[in-house]
């Protein structure tokens, strides 16, 4: 059984899910050093919905790669669900990604030869023994994103918005600690983008933790909170709307 599913029950609202402490990411170019992240300390808590914003060179992309366990910090601590991951090997980081992080990309990244149901199940292909509930959960997620009647459709038979819905369902198959969305509405028209943002709202209302990376202020303000970076540091934290009352 994926650890993400087992851990979901202990992601209580308000508890730390992602903890960054004095995180630095330094790139060396000859004799020069570029401090992409410069002493970042921040905590994302269960049930929160954040947008992460910043201009080119702010450290936004570097932070995205660290949060997604695609890269590791040069120094500092990065903990997911209490587990230190900053010093893990590539194979260990890959396992953490599969267990704790759900990705939604701008380009959907669906496999053309697979249908909707099969694409949703892709993250479980990497497990030696996919859980018995896998197909049932995939069907439920397809229903959840409004594609229960299109399980046999291939990506080229779906609109851009429908493909992104498949990508969101795929990202949720392991009950991740965080849903990490990178410019998730960037390839969509304004109407479809609003539909995807509405889906994020609904998932957040169900208790999902969402980190939405975007360069568009109107999209960023849609989240409850905004973390703005500049020169690898936190420049501003904005609370766009109050947390819903329990």
Positions of PLM-derived features:
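H-loop (His-switch) and adjacent beta-strand-loop-beta switch element
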Residues: 226-239
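ABC family nucleotide-binding domain
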Residues: 14-229
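ABC-family P-loop ATPase nucleotide-binding domain
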Residues: 1-26, 236-246
């Amino acid at each position: 059984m994926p650890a993400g599913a087992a851990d979901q029950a202990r992601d209580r609202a308000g508890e730390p899910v992602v903890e960054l402490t004095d995180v630095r990411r330094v790139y060396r170019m000859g004799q020069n050093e570029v401090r992409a992240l410069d002493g970042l300390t921040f905590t994302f808590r269960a049930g929160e919905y954040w947008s992460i914003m910043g201009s080119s060179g702010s450290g936004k992309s570097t932070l995205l790669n660290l949060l997604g366990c695609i890269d590791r910090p040069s120094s500092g601590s990065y903990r997911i669900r209490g587990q230190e991951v900053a010093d893990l090997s590539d194979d260990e980081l890959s396992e953490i990604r599969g267990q704790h992080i759900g990705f939604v990309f701008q380009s959907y990244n669906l496999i053309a030869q697979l249908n909707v149901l099969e694409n949703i199940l892709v993250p479980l292909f990497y497990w030696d023994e996919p859980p018995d509930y896998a197909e049932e959960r995939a069907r439920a997620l397809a229903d959840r994103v409004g594609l229960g009647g299109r399980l046999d459709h291939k990506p080229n038979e779906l609109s851009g918005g429908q493909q992104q819905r498949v990508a969101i369902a795929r990202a949720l198959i392991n009950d991740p600690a965080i849903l990490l969305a990178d410019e998730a509405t960037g390839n969509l028209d304004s109407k479809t983008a609003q539909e995807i943002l509405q889906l994020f709202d609904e998932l957040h209302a169900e208790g999902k933790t969402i980190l939405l990376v975007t360069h568009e202020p109107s999209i960023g303000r849609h989240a409850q909170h905004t973390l703005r970076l500049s020169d690898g540091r936190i420049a501003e934290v904005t609370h766009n709307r109050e947390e819903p009352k329990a």
